[in-house]
Amino acid sequence: MHFGGAMFFTDYSISAVDLALALEERGFESIWAPEHSHIPLSRKTPFPGGGDLPKPYYDAMDPFVVLAAAGQATKTIKLGTGVALIQQRDAIQTAKLVASLDQVSNGRFLFGVGGGWNQDEMEDHGTVFESRFKLMRERIEAMKEIWTKDKAEYHGEFVDFPTMMTWPKPAQKP
C-alpha cells in the first residue's frame, strides 16, 4: 500500500517544497495538489461537502507550478495533480506542460484528472457543464496523441488540430 499527502497550496499554507521534503523524509510515495483556477461568487452548484466553500479553494496556487518546485527540491517522491481540471485547459498547452513537468522531475509526475463539480467555474472557461466529460475525454485522447507521436493530429467535436510537432515528450510512457 502507498501513502501520499494532499492539500491546497496557498500563500499562507506550508509550501509544497516543505511538505514534499517532509513527506519524502517519512517515506511517503506522493504529494498531490488540486486545481481551481478561481471561484465565481455566483454559485449554480453547491459545494459537495455542504456549507460554505473553504477559503483554500479560493486561494489555491496553480498545481503544476507548486509541483514543479517540489520536484526540484526532492529526489523520489511522486508529484500528482489531484485533480487537474483539463476541461478548463487547452489540450496542446497542457500536453506540453505535463510532459515538461514529467521530464524535469525525472518521470515522477502523476497526472490525476477529474471532471469537476463547479459549473460556474467551468462556464467562465467556456465549458458547457453538461458536456464536460466528453470534452475531457477528447482532451485526454488529444494529449495522448501528442505524447506518443512525433507528428500528432486530432480531429474531434471539441478538440481539432492538424498534423503538428511538439516537444518534449513525457519521460514516462502514457
Placement of each model-derived feature along the sequence:
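Structural motif corresponding to the early beta-alpha repeats
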Residues: 64-72, 78-87
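N-terminal beta1-alpha1-beta2 module of alpha/beta enzyme domains
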Residues: 1-73, 173
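Internal, glycine-rich beta/alpha segment that forms the wall or movable "lid"
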Residues: 41, 52-53, 77, 81, ...
